[in-house]
Every structure is written in C-alpha cells, then in structure tokens.
Amino acid sequence: MKKFCLLFVLFFSVSVLDVTAQQDSTKPEKKSSSKSKIQYGLASFYSNKFNGRKTANGEIFSNQKLTAAHNTLPLGTYVRVTNLRNKRSVVVKINDRLHHKNKRIIDLSRAAATKLGFIKSGLTRVKVEVLGKKPPSK
C-alpha cells in the first residue's frame, strides 16, 4: 500500500510539472526593448583588438562607426546613449553582444565613447533610450 501511495504521488507530481511546463511554453517571450524603453547603468568601450572582427549580426566591427554591444536589445536596434556625467549623447546601432558575465549594460565603439567624452576614464554611467529599428532622421 505504501508503494502504491508513493507511486501515485510521484506520478501526480510529474503530471502537474508537465502541465505547468506546457502552460509556461505557450506564454509569449517578453522582450527587453518592449518592456523598458530606458535603462541606466555602466558603459565601457571596445578595445582596439576587436577592430576587423565579426560582430553578432555578422558585420565587421570598426571603432570608427557608431555601434554598440547590448545583451538584451534586438540586434539592429538604434539607441540614444547619454553620458550622465556631462549630458553628452550619441545615437548608436546595436550590432553585437556583451560577454554574458559582463556587468555593464552597453559596450560602445571608440567613436561613440569619444563623442560621449569618456575615453580617459574608460567607464561612465549612462542612460540608454530605445529609439527603434529605423535610424533616426538627422
């Protein structure tokens, strides 16, 4: 009788877990860009050693372009990055990903970091505003 009860409880538990897993898989995946249009955090910029390497979207990285790496925004998204220390801002295209253990929210090209004025410090606090998939009109 104890074995029967144990088997029944085990079977019931597995059935409940299976139903729960199926329900979770039908929920649409939440995208970072649709939930939060503004993020705050720490920014850095690419080392020169990455020049000429492929980015996550297949483009060749150039420190002279206004591009950036971000872990949750869709590739091809344009964002406005504002340096919170000096209020300078720049629009960049997300074309790469950060290392998954990186605590920064964005890694910018050298050109973008120069426009934001943090080459000497190497890091700065920023505001990142999602603009969308189309480049902003100038």
Tell what function each PLM region has.
Residues K2-L6, L10, D18-K138:
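Secreted/periplasmic proteins
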